[in-house]
Regions:
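A short alpha-helix capping/helix-coil boundary motif
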Residues: 13, 94-98, 133-137
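N-terminal amphipathic alpha-helix/helix-capping segment at the start of soluble metabolic enzymes
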Residues: 1-10, 122, 126-140
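Metal- or metallocofactor-binding catalytic centers and their adjacent structured scaffolds
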Residues: 38-123
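Short glycine-/small-residue-rich flexible loop motifs, especially phosphate/cofactor-binding loops
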Residues: 34, 118, 156
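General structural feature for long, well-ordered alpha-helical segments within catalytic domains
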Residues: 65, 84, 88, 108, ...
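Structured beta-strand/loop patches that form or line metal/cofactor-binding pockets in enzymes
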Residues: 1-57
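Metal-dependent enolase-superfamily TIM-barrel catalytic cores that perform enediolate-based chemistry
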Residues: 130-188
């Protein structure tokens, strides 16, 4: 049985040097909200709460976590790492319905789920990827994201200089512009 003894939450906020333009808006900040759950063995499990957009989504989710989740997580116990997800997802159904905010609550529950699985794997002394799939690779590929269409060549060059070989650019504005951007990258 895993007993959660301590909770820490970290809100990171980074001002973008160049705002990221996407089909759903302009991102001037990048936020990351990380939950750390510490158990009776002093193991830490980490989970990230999705809060990429809008700009202040991280602070909003931080406040929801403090107001609704933190006290429930204190002294929370679980044996199966799937149990916390089910418990917290169901626990806030009425609030999600009343507020109409399914997204933020679900994002937080997902972050808790990741932290619980991480904690479970550490108690089993098994890397999480191997716990979930013993045949999973030891290394994963990464990609560069947040690349605006009008500066994709410069950003892709920067990423390549860091050893990154895969890229994700923003599309979804105008079909002809999107095709033109993708064709220029293909030639690039």
């Amino acid at each position: 049985m895993i007993h959660i003894n301590k909770i820490k939450i970290y809100l990171f906020k980074y001002k973008n040097k160049n705002p990221v333009l996407s089909s759903f808006g302009r991102m001037t900040f990048r936020s990351s909200l990380v939950i750390e759950l510490i158990d009776q063995n002093n193991n830490s499990g980490f989970g990230e709460v999705w809060c990429n957009f809008p700009n202040h989504a991280g602070m909003y989710r931080f406040e929801i976590f403090k107001d609704y989740f933190a006290n429930l997580l204190k002294k929370f116990e679980f044996e199966n790492p799937s149990d916390p997800f089910s418990f917290f997802y169901e626990k806030f159904n009425s609030i999600k319905i009343q507020s109409g905010d399914y997204g933020a609550f679900s994002n937080i529950v997902s972050g808790i789920d990741c932290a619980c699985w991480d904690l479970f794997s550490k108690n089993k002394k098994t890397p999480l990827n191997k716990l979930l799939n013993n045949n999973s690779p030891d290394k994963i590929q990464v990609y560069a994201s947040g690349i605006n269409r009008d500066e994709h060549k410069e950003r892709i060059n920067e990423a390549r200089n860091l050893g990154i070989k895969k890229f994700k650019i923003k599309i979804g504005y105008d079909l002809n512009d999107d095709i033109s951007s993708l064709e220029s990258i293909e030639k690039f």
